[in-house]
Amino acid sequence: MSGRKSLLLAVLLAALSGGVARAQDAPPASDMLLATLWTQRAVEYRANALAVFSLARIRLDEALVDRNWTAAPAEQSGDFQNLPPAVVLDVDETLLDNSKYQVWMMRTNQSFSTKSWNQFCAAQVSTAIPGAVEFATYADSKGVKVFYVTNRGAETEKDTRENMQRLGFPLGGNVDTFLMQAETPDWTSAKGTRRAYVARDYRILLNIGDNLGDFDDRYRTSEADRVKAFEAGMPYWGRQWLMLANPTYGSFDTAPYGHDFKKSRDEQRKSKWDVLESWMGPSP
């Protein structure tokens, strides 16, 4: 083989091997890509979050004046009008941006696991959702106790508290305002028992979250029942209850396949396609 042919062959082999390496390095396709890109990079998402927290300030001021105002209709009872004020805030994707964990899952083709999630929490790399710190400190300045009702496990409380303290969130002084999942036996992923715990001693002015489960315990039901729960809360949406957008994960994502996490990714994806309505396309 001539020297020129040998050189061309070497160049060709190098190009092919480089292409194989690039193909191997490329992250696998993921259903979460567009939603994660939006929450992490889009100014439209930031504007949406700022709008929610700006409205929250307005609603908070209204609630402080109206002593009959409560954001916990199912849990607040008796003569609550003279109780000290509080707000109930979800943490993940309401106050803290965890999109870095989503990106890690996509790049490594991993699904959510408690082990990796707790390791992410321990890294304390979550950032603040736009407007979240400012609203929490505003509420605190008004004498409103800020409770963080989160489905992070109790084992992550120290890391969560330190992460949020560093970002500037008020911590509650001598009151434990971090109400973690499984901190007590009846504090399950459904948050009603924790809202009831707060409502015993405080008038809950606002409830802010990113998932139906932050407001109503009927979140992990069928799509039809979720619609009924949403409609039952119509008097509260936009007033006592404020919702941030989170297209990356949540009970909306699992409802099409009945929240059956034993189903494969392909089965889950098929169930999602099955519930979507489509245009039939242009006429022939």
Predicted features, each with a name:
Residues A21-L89, G258-F261, R265-D266, K270-P284:
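Non-catalytic pre-domain segments flanking phosphatase-related domains
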Residues P84-A86, L95-P130, E134, S141:
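Active-site neighborhood of HAD-like aspartate-dependent phosphohydrolases
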Residues W38-A49, N118-S126, F147-G153, E183-T184:
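Second-shell loop/turn segments in exported
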Residues L9-S17:
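Bacterial N-terminal signal peptides
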Residues M1-L8:
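Bacterial N-terminal signal peptides that target proteins for export
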Residues L64-Q76, V146-N151, G173-D176:
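Surface-exposed patches in mature extracellular/periplasmic domains of secreted proteins
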Residues E93, A123, A132-Q165, L212:
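Substrate-recognition element of Asp-dependent hydrolases with the DxDx(T/V) motif
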Residues S54, G153, E157-P284:
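C-terminal cap/substrate-recognition subdomain and adjoining C-terminal extension
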